Curated annotation (Swiss-Prot):
Catalyzes the reductive methylation of 2'-deoxyuridine-5'-monophosphate (dUMP) to 2'-deoxythymidine-5'-monophosphate (dTMP) while utilizing 5,10-methylenetetrahydrofolate (mTHF) as the methyl donor, and NADPH and FADH(2) as the reductant. It is an enzyme of class 2 (transferase). A motif (ThyX motif) lies at residues 80-90. The gene is thyX. Binds 4 FAD per tetramer. Each FAD binding site is formed by three monomers. PANTHER family: FLAVIN-DEPENDENT THYMIDYLATE SYNTHASE. Signal peptide: none annotated. Pathway: Pyrimidine metabolism; dTTP biosynthesis. This is Flavin-dependent thymidylate synthase. It comes from Saccharolobus solfataricus (strain ATCC 35092 / DSM 1617 / JCM 11322 / P2).
């Protein structure tokens, strides 16, 4: 089962971002702003930066995740987000044999063709092991491993990149596994920096807040709690009409229920 754990982060990230945002509009230095910065002021400066697209200040807070038991399909999608750092389990040095060979079966295949997928995975494993026993080096034998083979990866992103990552990967149009990873990553960062990630979400949320009045901005929490909430946008950038956007977001998060 997919595991996502936040293992390291900028402890005062919210305050750092707020001070950086304030310093950009002030002649005063860090010490002056830090000593008088209140929690309410931190929230105000973060909110102002996000709702006005002042994204550069978000780069000062950094997060490292350990993401485990995912497929190579998912890890290949992760590394497409280039403003990040990655260290992945090597199948050259960490051979996926015996109990460590746990390829991922997609939920759709579990419902329809689980036996077929398991058979294909077993054949691939048997061929891989045969190649190893015949003397083929690990770096070459791994060529026959399936894309579904399980892997672990350490990922580091700053808050700005996370906002970009979430805008794309929390969307219901994202593939199920990378979407599940994104929702789990969001859960992790919200535990430590709820004010900073209050306004994140798929692109439809970001765009909606750009066209709303500041005192009418919405959050993902509003989507799941207020069933009367209506979007102003006529359609999202993926083409979903206004009346269907909220349902689309709710359906996107349901991927977490499908992988339990």
């Amino acid at each position: 089962m997919i595991s996502v754990k936040l293992v390291s982060y900028t402890n005062d990230g919210e305050k750092v971002i707020a001070i950086a945002a304030k310093m950009s509009r002030s002649r005063k230095g860090w010490d002056y702003h830090e000593k008088d910065m209140t929690d309410d002021e931190i929230e105000t400066w973060i909110r102002d930066a996000i709702l006005h697209g002042y994204w550069s200040v978000l780069e000062h807070s950094v997060y490292t995740f350990s993401i485990e038991e995912i497929s190579r399909v998912a890890s290949h999608q992760l590394v497409r987000h280039r403003i990040a750092s990655y260290t992945q389990m090597s199948h050259r040095f960490a051979k996926p044999i015996d109990e460590y060979y746990k390829p991922i079966i997609p939920p759709s295949a579990k419902k329809r063709s689980k036996e077929l997928v398991e058979k294909a995975y077993k054949e691939a494993y048997d061929n891989y092991y045969t190649l190893l026993e015949s003397g083929v080096p690990e770096e070459d034998a791994r060529y026959v491993l399936p894309n579904g083979v399980n892997t672990n990866i350490v990922v580091t992103m700053n808050a700005r990149e996370l906002y970009n990552f979430f805008s794309l990967r929390l969307c219901s149009r994202a593939q199920w596994e990378i979407r599940a990873i994104a929702w789990k990553m969001l859960e992790e960062v919200k535990k430590v920096h709820p004010r900073l990630f209050k306004y994140t979400g798929p692109n439809c949320i970001i765009h909606e807040n750009f066209i709303r009045n500041e005192n009418e901005s919405i959050t993902l929490e509003d989507i799941f709690k207020d069933y009367k909430l209506e979007f102003i946008s006529q359609r999202c950038i993926e083409g979903v009409l206004r009346d269907g956007i909220k349902k689309c977001i709710i359906n996107s998060r349901s991927v977490l229920d499908n992988i339990k």
